[in-house]
Amino acid sequence: MAMTLLPRHGKTHLANIPYGYYTATVSLIFIILLIGARKLIPVRQRNRSKWAKWALSSARGGSPLLYLVVLFVALLVPFVHHYSLLGYVGLYLKRLGRLSYVLATLNLFLTLRPNFLLPGYVYLDLIPLHKWLSRSLCLLALVHGVGFLVKWALDSQVSFVAKAFYNIPNLAGLVVGALMAFMVLLSVRPVRRFSYRSFYLTHIIGAWVFVFLTAYHARPGVFVPYTLLNAGLFVFYILSKTVPARGVELVSKSTDDVNNCLTRIVLPRKAMPEHFAPGSHLRISPYRRVNPLYYMLPSHPYTVASMPEDKDVELIVREHASGFHLLTGLGYTIQNHYESVPRQCLQSATRIALVCGGSGLSYALPIFRHFASEEKADQVKYLRLIWLVRDKYDVNVLGNIRSLASSVAQFDIFVTRSVPPDDTVESGSKLSPAQQQSPITDDLEFELESFGDQLDQNGALITPEIPNLPSGLASSFHFGRKLDWMTDLAQFVEREDLGSTWLVACGPKGLNDAAKLYAQQNEINLASETYAL
């Protein structure tokens, strides 16, 4: 009697391997497109249609709406091929799983800090793309898992319990799917804002579990090359948090708990390298590198308010009761620093306006000082910093800022809660009366929520006291009104200098949206940073 050997797997067992390689190739082309778009597309789009401007600006800016549509069109067009969709449901469910795993390599690549392979991007540029690609991967993984659960439940020839729980590789996939669903839940904005630490911890654990447990779950295997590539990216992630890290203690901390104003924190100069760009960020962890929590819990980002030539590293922050506080006498770990301002702006701008709110001064001030330096004297034609603050006491953080020698630099401070009884101040600062609020800034979310006059118990206006400021730093104070973009920046834009005109904004989404609209209307360059989770 002859013995017949039957194949362990069906004829479609290896059918998804070529599609995995195709996805990897598309991912590589995707990275090349990101690099090429940033290098070849100019910052400003002129003499083009509305849609052409949007497409080019989105391509240069790494817009998730544009790039993810392009990516998934390229991936889904050949998704159903050779085998019918209804006849081979299991094959295409497996293909979804392989697609999500291969794209994880691209997603991890986008999170590298610093990413030397993506020149021209500052590290904040690609966060929206990473966020939406992560959600897409979770969705693909969930459809893959739920699809198989439904398939087994409807198939009378198989045991659902045996397939889902007794088959160990399938059980591993079930664990991954449950974790993906939990990650999606925690990524919803209200939940994420309620407990960012929980979101971050789950995010980190989920990434590692997804990479290594899926490698055990997947059939045919994905260890070579995908798991190896992902493991290599994890190694780089660990090295980037350990090799440049350095321990520090606070030099000093100046705060006013009574008035709840901005806090000035001074770190030793070694907290930053010898050379760094103005407006750079650093990330601080309360844990040492030997503590596992150093890698599992989020570090805290701060914008450096200092310049490389300063003797200390200064931070300007607004501390909240429930937030993270830097305290004197404790040790902290500086993980790394990252540039946040486009180099083209720092190198070639000739007309610069900086608009910031509250602690956003830490972003704008070093950029302002950079352009007010003697080295930029012949280059800069217009330089103005507009700082929007809630209370007059916030201005005290400027007490140790040295004077500026620039002949074109202007510093305007809008104090929104205190209105003087007249237009005179003994210090000689110029005061503007309250004016009609510009509708473009009506939705500011953080510092500017209160514009009421300060009144005493008899209803009289309280006269503001101007803190002492270094000479040459502030050119005017404005009490009790918002910024009117068109009026207060009336001398900013010159048609012959549009290519080298930069508007720099830092604050909540409302402020940055207003800045974006102003930049679009005037066809100038924009660099902005939003302070939000």
From Swiss-Prot:
Membrane topology: Multi-pass membrane protein
Designated gene of the protein: AIM14
Pfam families cross-referenced by the UniProt entry: FAD_binding_8, Ferric_reduct, NAD_binding_6
PANTHER family: METALLOREDUCTASE AIM14-RELATED (PTHR11972:SF198), NADPH OXIDASE (PTHR11972)
Organism for this UniProt entry: Lachancea thermotolerans (strain ATCC 56472 / CBS 6340 / NRRL Y-8284) (Yeast)
Function of the molecule: Probable cell surface metalloreductase. May be involved in iron or copper homeostasis.
Subcellular location: Membrane
Keywords annotated in UniProt: Electron transport, FAD, Flavoprotein, Ion transport, Membrane, NADP, Oxidoreductase, Transmembrane, Transmembrane helix, Transport
Transmembrane segments: 17-37, 61-81, 102-122, 136-156, 168-188, 198-218, 220-240
Protein name: Probable metalloreductase AIM14
